[in-house]
Amino acid sequence: MSWLKEVIGTEKAVIAMCHLRALPGDPSFDAQLGMNWVIDKAWDDLMALQNGGVDAVMFSNEFSLPYLTKVRPETTAAMARIIGQLMSDIRIPFGVNVLWDPVASFDLAMATGAKFIREIFTGAYASDFGVWDTNVGETIRHQHRIGAGEVKTLFNIVPEAAVYLGNRDICSIAKSTVFNNHPDALCVSGLTAGTRTDSALLKRVKETVPDTVVLANTGVCLENVEEQLSIADGCVTATTFKKDGVFANFVDQARVSQFMEKVHHIRR
């Protein structure tokens, strides 16, 4: 039995993303609509996800495009306010993801009581955001310095819109990441949000680290969820839950329910 059962309540867990709209300081933030509108839309999406039956939810600043690798304090503060106002209505385990800043994610997790975070913790990359370097040693020390040792860590080892600097095979990356960092899970992704995770790649990673939770991190949908969950220990998904399966849209509860009905059938 993996920690998914203990923390989320089931194996083959479905972690649904609650994508927060652009926040103060983001280029797309609408100051006329303001934070109350962002909170209202987050509540709508949260309700649709929970009522549709997902196992857990993860809040992320998905519309803070283009992303920073070290976020400004107003981003974390805005996310803390949103989650704080939603707290009384959160009925399932939740995590947070401050894109793309693992230190800020730990800070937000401690402020809100989140059970897990997902981030790019390791590696150096050429990315759409410039040369992207990480400092996992300092990040994990920060985790323990602030008392966040119980927060589960989901290591994304195939970062979106980026390529590893250096010719390293994904299996080598998976193996050394597990050895050096003891992650609670590895996330395997496609190129961008909503892009399908390659099943062959997912299989190679899971076979390399069979004792570590491996999650399909992008592009899981009604058509491929059975195949993906036959390999992975669970999935993180968002786009397929949105109206017409379009990233920019809001969550459609009917799509969530249909997806989860299939997942329950797979779990039997």
UniProtKB/Swiss-Prot annotation:
Coiled coil: none annotated. Pfam families: BtpA (PF03437). Transmembrane segments: none annotated. Belongs to the BtpA family. This is Putative sgc region protein SgcQ.
